[in-house]
Amino acid sequence: MNDPLRNFLDKIKPSFQGKGGLSYYFPIFDVIENLFYSSDKRTKGLTHVRDGSDIQRIMVVVWLATFPTMFAGMYNLGYQSLNAIEQLTLANTAFEKDWHWPLITFFTSLNPNSFMDCLVYGAIYFIPIYVVVFAVGIGCELIFALIRRHEVSEGAFVTTVLFALSCPPNAPLWQCALGIAVGLVIGKEIFGGTGKNFLNPALTGRAFLYFAYPASWSGDMSWVAVDGYTAATILGTAAQDGYQSLAYTWNNAFLGFIPGSIGETSTLAILVGLAILLYTKVASWRIVLGVAIGTIFTSYLFNIVGSETNPMFSMPFWWHMVIGGYAFGLVFMATEPVSGSHTNAGRWV
């Protein structure tokens, strides 16, 4: 089959290889080529065990597994925000309108009962975050690839989407850019790159921003994409007043109709991603089951001990599993193939 793009890349590839005039910039060519095509490198030798999977395919599987969470998160973000706008409008309460607003009014009718309006509203907030995080993340990878004279790791594609999904919808874009840069440089590159890091770069960047800019990454104004509107997360409310005081049902939390970071709200969507990871054997079922057993045991222990000052001691394990970042962290962070456990015993622990 005649493929113009493939022919063009094959034509210019020699210039980026060996003693070609552009060989220094081979990592840039490599990331563009691998973005559209599978790697043409094949291991040869009679003693090598061959498998149908490689790093590129594994990372693509993880990336695709985030899609249910991504779309559910965008829809819920729009649903929460459009309901908030409706409440403010009925109460004749003014709210700030930032640069997102012209796009929102152009592409939506501000109807919280419209599936497409909710999805598009959420996309208007999430896509800029993802684009900025992706561009800065790949930029950091390219810089280190050029310095070290090696190929760009496909792991950056997964790190950027996981980091973007962990962001609050109102997070400033420059802070998102700073966070992914810190996560990749401090969490991975200073240890030598993919396969040598013991920290999860997405979590490293998220933790840095949580402590460096707490006003933007915690509190009550970060979770619904309406400037000036306050809404506590379900975990924050439960920690302060107990889970019995929640305005949301367990089903609301499981399906994802609650405020929160873009990727953490829908446990159902996250479980769809988990099914993909387990079916393709990218994730270890031992890690998933080990964390679940540990959660149940620890939760029952706190239930037995009890506390008059900390309402979280009384929360049953099934609530722990559907609020906060528990499900997202379990499925996409704990099972991460580089920083996660590699031995079967370690996966249980």
Q: What residue ranges belong to the model's regions?
A:
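Structural signature of hydrophobic alpha-helical transmembrane segments
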Residues: 119-133, 170-179, 253-267, 313-326
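Cytoplasmic-side transmembrane-helix entry/capping segments in multi-pass membrane proteins
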Residues: 150-159, 177-178, 196-206, 285-293, ...
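Long hydrophobic alpha-helical segments that form multi-pass transmembrane helix bundles
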Residues: 192-271
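N-terminal signal-anchor module of multipass membrane proteins
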Residues: 1-126, 130
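C-terminal ends of transmembrane helices
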Residues: 43-49, 136-149, 185-195, 272-281, ...
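Hydrophobic alpha-helical bundle architecture
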Residues: 165-168, 273-286, 299-349
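A generic, well-ordered mixed alpha/beta core segment in the N-terminal half of proteins
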Residues: 142, 153-223
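Alpha-helical transmembrane segments in multi-pass membrane proteins
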Residues: 61-72, 128-141, 156-160, 164, ...
